[in-house]
């Protein structure tokens, strides 16, 4: 049963959506000659609340997962890290669907007429809805995930869906795409739901936190960090702090794992850091922030300060290739060190252009470290200081592209494209190229 605070939060959301947002959307009259919105109109499909707002009441229903209720605050950004901050929140990436929904309501080219739209946004909280299939009573019915949505799309104004066979539809799924890729024919069911395996959804675009090795429907977008500035001065103030921060440590690993005896990249990192710290008494070469058991998930203070003090942030794959810490590190101006392309280079092509990776990151193949004796320390120390400075500046330049600014931001900050803006641009380009 939802807590009292959750019910209060939901009441605020209902008030916001039905008494504030709806008139704003309808007041945006369409002009066929509006050059700024040519090929950029988006229609937000009106879905029954069971597909979005009602799902928020399940925020504490699954004991095996974290209680998401506290992180519904501030339209999904979570509670502030402290009362006086204007930019830092305890954000849970699983609420990206809610964050994106709130932000797209500010998109300047919304149209109430689906026939004029280049893209149709489905405000369906697929990741939150998937919890009942992953951890709840519908565990053995995971192949049904999406059937209710499909039935609605094909029965309520079916011409919107059928006009382009779903090619112009997109949604956000705040989990790795693997979690929605269980084959429909597997019996007994394995991990995940079958949403992306449904033939009817093959044409839509899904914005996920991580894509598969052979993405067709999905495109990975950055994990939300805890940094959500609301004005340009706050962003510029943070960038100044990042630039003047003293980088007293060569490299940092913030994460868990690596404690098993079997060879893997996280174990190699831990062993190298332990060895370095045992022999170095003056210069700090390797810093380690233990984030085991999820203790860092909603506490950015644990890792942001060490990231600000490090030149390089190690980003080894874990249970899945991608890491939220990649984007935490970029926000801190910490140069990412990758050990396989699937961690970022092959994932976030809209936000981190593949052709520019060498300008702001270092790649060391994990096989070289685990099996061939390559020391990470040696590779990083061989990079000239001037090159490190230049790379850090490129990381800082990338910062706005991977951050999610706060809803209701100032016009000055809105002129800088953030992760949502770039995702929308990518979706529109993708749809236009396909239809």
UniProtKB/Swiss-Prot annotation:
Transmembrane spans: 7-23
Principal cellular location given in the protein's record: Golgi
Lumenal topology ranges: 24-435
Any one of the GO BP annotations: protein glycosylation
Disulfide bonds: none
Membrane topology recorded in Swiss-Prot or TrEMBL: Single-pass type II membrane protein
GO MF annotations, alphabetized: glycosyltransferase activity
E.C. designation(s): 2.4.1.-
Record's subcellular location: Golgi apparatus membrane
A Pfam family of this chain: Exostosin_GT47
Residues carrying a glycan: 140, 203, 277
Cellular component terms per the entry's GO annotation: Golgi membrane
Keyword entries, A-Z: Glycoprotein, Glycosyltransferase, Golgi apparatus, Membrane, Signal-anchor, Transferase, Transmembrane, Transmembrane helix
Regions of this protein lying in the Cytoplasmic compartment: 1-6
Tissue-specific expression: Expressed in roots, hypocotyls, cotyledons, leaves, stems, stamens and pollen grains.
Family indicated by similarity: Belongs to the glycosyltransferase 47 family.
Function, as annotated: Functions in xyloglucan synthesis by adding side chains to the xylosylated glucan backbone. Involved in the galactosylation of hemicellulose xyloglucan.
Protein name per its UniProtKB record: Probable xyloglucan galactosyltransferase GT19
Species, as recorded: Arabidopsis thaliana (Mouse-ear cress)
Species lineage: Eukaryota, Viridiplantae, Streptophyta, Embryophyta, Tracheophyta
């Amino acid at each position: 049963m939802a807590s009292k605070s959750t019910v209060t939060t939901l009441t605020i959301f209902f008030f916001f959506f039905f008494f504030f947002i709806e008139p704003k959307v309808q007041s945006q009259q369409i002009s066929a000659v509006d050059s700024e919105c040519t090929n950029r109109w988006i229609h937000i499909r009106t879905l029954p609340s069971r597909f979005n707002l009602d799902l928020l009441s399940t925020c504490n229903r699954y004991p095996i997962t974290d209680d998401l209720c506290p992180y519904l605050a501030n339209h999904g950004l979570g509670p502030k890290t402290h009362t006086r901050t204007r930019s830092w929140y305890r954000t849970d990436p699983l609420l990206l669907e809610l964050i994106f929904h709130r932000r797209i309501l500010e998109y300047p080219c919304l149209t109430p007429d689906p026939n004029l739209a280049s893209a149709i946004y489905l405000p369906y909280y697929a990741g939150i809805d998937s919890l009942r299939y992953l951890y709840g009573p519908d565990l053995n019915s995971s192949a049904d995930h999406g059937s209710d949505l499909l039935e609605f799309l094909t029965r309520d104004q079916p011409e919107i869906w059928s006009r382009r066979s779903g090619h112009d539809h997109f949604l956000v799924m705040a989990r790795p795409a693997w979690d929605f890729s269980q084959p429909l024919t597997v019996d007994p069911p394995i991990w995940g739901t079958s949403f992306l395996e449904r033939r009817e959804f093959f044409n839509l675009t899904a914005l996920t936190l991580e894509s598969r090795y052979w993405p067709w429907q999905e495109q990975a977008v950055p994990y939300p960090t805890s940094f959500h500035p609301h004005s340009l001065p706050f962003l510029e103030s943070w960038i100044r702090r990042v630039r003047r921060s003293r980088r007293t440590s060569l490299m940092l690993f913030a994460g868990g794992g690596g404690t098993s005896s079997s060879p893997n990249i996280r174990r190699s990192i831990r062993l190298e850091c332990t060895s370095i710290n045992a022999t170095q008494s003056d210069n700090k070469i390797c810093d380690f922030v233990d984030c085991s058991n999820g203790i860092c998930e909603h506490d950015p203070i644990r890792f942001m300060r060490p990231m600000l003090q490090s030149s390089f942030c190690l980003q080894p794959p874990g249970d899945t290739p991608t890491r939220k810490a990649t984007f935490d590190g970029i926000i801190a101006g910490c140069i990412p060190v990758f050990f396989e392309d699937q961690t970022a280079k092959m994932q976030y092509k809209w936000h981190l252009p593949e052709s520019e990776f060498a300008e702001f990151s270092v790649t060391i193949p994990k096989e070289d470290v685990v099996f061939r004796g390559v020391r990470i320390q040696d590779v990083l120390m061989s990079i000239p200081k001037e090159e490190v400075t230049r790379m850090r500046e490129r990381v800082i330049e990338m910062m706005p592209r991977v951050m999610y600014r706060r809803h209701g931001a100032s016009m000055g900050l809105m002129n800088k494209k953030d992760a949502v803006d770039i995702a929308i641009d990518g979706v529109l380009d993708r749809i236009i190229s396909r239809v």
